[in-house]
Amino acid sequence: MYFDSKMKKASQIKKILLAFATPARAKVNAWFFKTGKGQYGEGDIFIGVRVPEVRSVVKGVSLEIPLTEVEKLLQDRVHEVRLCALLILVKLFQEAKNKGEKKQVFTFYTKHTKYINNWDLVDTSAHIIVGEYISDYMEHEERLVFINKYIVSKSLWENRIIVLATLYQIKKGNEKMLFYVAERLLHHSHDLMHKAIGWMLREVGKKSGEKTLMEFLDAHIR
């Protein structure tokens, strides 16, 4: 599908996403992401757009898109539209020329976590935006305050954001941030958190070695 490679309007972006909608896939996604009553994704709306299709739309979004337009997408009821907004933020963050531009995206992201409300939305964005920013652009004390705020948050998704944010450090061979977070969230009540922590611990094993991983597990789990 052809579309303008300089898109700056939320309405234009959403229109293209809607053109990719597939009712059958929407039904499957609604089940997969637990949108039923009492489930973690209760009430979320899917239109059946595949992630590669969302990414193809993001490629056509201008780096000059105003955050006010991204906000319209992020506040949308449709899940894939919110995913698109987050992938746009990732694009803006990665293409940012300096700390100031990165901070602008990071601040916007952290002020809108109520809309980052499913595991895929967290997992496609947190390690890039939050992980890099708090690691590379915050002093130790500021970083610790931020991490603790997300650890004690009553929001499942903010809890998951801080776990996934540690992936940035893990990939650099530093597992300390994850171990700090994991120690405090190991007994979280939600299975999605157990899965997130387990995933990050496996990444530690791959990057820092089984010995490092087993020392943590022996001390905290066994």
Predicted region positions:
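Alpha-helical scaffold domains
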Residues: 2-222
